[in-house]
C-alpha cells in the first residue's frame, strides 16, 4: 500500500485529508509539526509527503529544504498544501524543493491526480543519458 505522510497541525484539516486519502486507498500517517515531519520521513520512508507551510517548531518551507538536503529523504516527492495563495509563497516553496504546490481548500481530485503523477514519475527509471 502506498504510504503518505501528512504534515499538518490543524486537526480539522488533517481529519478531512486523512479520511479522503484513506478512502482513495492510501495508508496515511500524520506529523503535527515540521520537526516531527522531518523525523517521521526518515523513519517511515513514505512514498509521498503532503505538507502545510504554517507549522509549529519548523515551518513547511524549512522542513522541505531539510528533507531535500538529506540523502535518505531527498527522493520523496513533497506536495505543499497551504492557505498561502500569493505567488511569493509558491516560489519560496518551489525554491525549497517541493514538487508541487496546491492551495487550500484543495480540489481533492486535482490533489489525487498530482499524487498519482508524482508517484508514477518516481517509479519510472531515469532516462538513459548515453542516447
Locate the predicted segments by residue.
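Active-site beta3 strand of CheY-like receiver
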Residues: 44-50, 55
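C-terminal output helix
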Residues: 106-116
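Short hydrophobic/Thr-rich beta-strand motif most characteristic of the beta2 strand and flanking loop
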Residues: 25-32, 40
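Conserved acidic segment of CheY-like receiver
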Residues: 2-12, 17-21
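The feature encodes the CheY-like receiver
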Residues: 56, 74, 86, 105
